[in-house]
Amino acid sequence: MGNVIGIVAEYNPFHNGHARLIEQTRAQLGAVCPVVCVMSGDFVQRGSPAVYSKFARAEAAVRCGADLVLELPLPWSLSSAEGFARGAVGLLGSLGVVTHLSFGSECGELDPLQRVAEALLDPLLGEDLRAELRSGIPFAAARQQAIARRVGALAELLQAPNNILAVEYLKAIYDQRLELHPLTVLRTGAQHDRFAEGNIRSASELRMRIGAGEDVSAFLPRAAAEIFAREKTRGRGPVLPEALESALLSRLRMLPQTVYNALPGATEGLGNSLYRAAHEEPTLDGVLAAAKSKRYALARIRRMTMCAALGVTAGMDGGTPPYARVLAIGAQGRELLRAIDMRASVPVITKPAAGRSLPGPAGEIFALTADAHDLYVLGCPAREERRCGGDWRASPFVL
């Protein structure tokens, strides 16, 4: 087949900016180019539950222009920006049909992002980074200073969240030697966590408004707004972090210290700090604040906390996902799936029961991701929506 567009996303929630990325990419490559998305599941990279379930968000994506939505398994969804990008881009590459990777960025230009990505791949960078860290500055600042030695002012690109992910996508393409042609679209509307004018808002602002009970439908495509309104009416969302606090705290308090020391990122005593905090603090925010160190960002501690509660251990996010689970199928999705079935290097799962027969680590990761859904639904407003085992029963949404 011809060009196939790959997009990595969380769609937390799906908004007008996401629809714009699909439209503008098709404007460059052709209006009928199929779009396959790799999307985080019920828990997202910032270490929080998604405001709506992966099934609702995947349905919104295909109703708003995507043709196929695949789930990024839990260990990569809760990984660092580097691990998240490596897993998602690797999964797109393993399908055997994706020709282009499209992503938004605050920069909007490919060349500067590629220069920063190349600098990050410099084998000598680690030595410079360690030297910066010895001065006691936070990791992000140390990395930026080490990069600045190579690319000067371009290192400032790493201060913007979508630029950071864009650079990690490019690194993943280079590292894995994938034949994916990158495209970037200028991200308009709000910067991360800032208000903006017009009908595009950042996902972080929309989550804040949703948490406050505001109507955000003006900033969503109509189909997405209808889906999320349906989920709210049925008591399946929004799922807010505070709704899961008791479930998470009870889980964290039952875990032995060895589990904390085996978490992703549990270096320099972070595992011990998180263990102590989980057994002393009365709130989840208190746990995060007590475990936080000067060197590492709060998001890292939040991810570690969620990994502990959900059973994710160090090394699970190594390499790339060993299967492709289909969450939703859009207009060209069936044709796309037929092509993927012939060319993919990993099993393609359309019926969740097939996940039980996946061999070795693949089966373990599939089950772990399904178990995470059982914890996620405990945050649903309606008690009848909190049934266990739903991930094993759910079929892909078909447009």
Which role fits each region the language model picked out?
Residues 26, 58-62, 171-174, 207:
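Class I S-adenosyl-L-methionine
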Residues 58-73:
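A glycine-rich helix N-cap at a beta->alpha junction
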Residues 3, 33, 67, 98-99:
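Conserved acidic residues
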Residues 9, 44-45, 61, 75-76, ...:
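Short, contiguous strand/loop micro-motifs
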Residues 1-57:
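N-terminal catalytic cores of NTP/NDP-binding nucleotidyl/phosphoryl-transfer enzymes
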Residues 30, 64, 96:
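Structured loop/turn residues at beta-strand edges in well-structured enzyme cores
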